[in-house]
Amino acid sequence: MPQVNLKLSSHDRQVLESIFNPLELSSTQPSVSVPCESELADVEPDTEAVRSSRELELQGVLLTEKGSFDEALKVFQLALNQAQRASVLNNRAQTLRLAKRDGEALDDLNKALEMASDQQSRTKCHAHCQRGVLYRKLDNLDAARSDFEAAAQLGSKFAREQLVEINPFAALCNQMLRKAFDQLQ
């Protein structure tokens, strides 16, 4: 797309900014720093049960990547038997989604978010994103928006993009901008 030097008033820029960055408040106060998703981490106790659960969880993820969903679900259950961890529930929810078992995935995501502490920001971020996707699929845009906002506050770029997509004003603005750029070419 060609670079265009548009002369927008400060009000127009503020309107566009509020549409494309719905989480940033337009005020004179400095904006709150949102972490980058790659900076997120889960802090968990270093016990034998947690280490064993992590190893099994990784095996479950690898099985999911190979498309062995039933086997992965069994391994995730073994991981949960070792230690009840939000991360395992979040990853099992991903497997359930891929296996087209959305209701069970939603249950796991709800449990993961209830279980996750503030020290498990990575899992919370991913669980909010996954649940937002499920809610969006179910056409529950208010619930999806709420989850995407929570994930975006934790640093998810994907969640910020989803918020723009489900924002009707942003969609209208995108359409108008595309039309304007097409006319300039």
Curated annotation (Swiss-Prot):
GO terms for biological process: tyrosine metabolic process. Keywords: Repeat, TPR repeat. TPR repeats lie at residues 53-86, 88-119, 125-158. Pfam families: TPR_8 (PF13181). Belongs to the TTC36 family. This is Tetratricopeptide repeat protein 36 homolog. It comes from Drosophila pseudoobscura pseudoobscura.
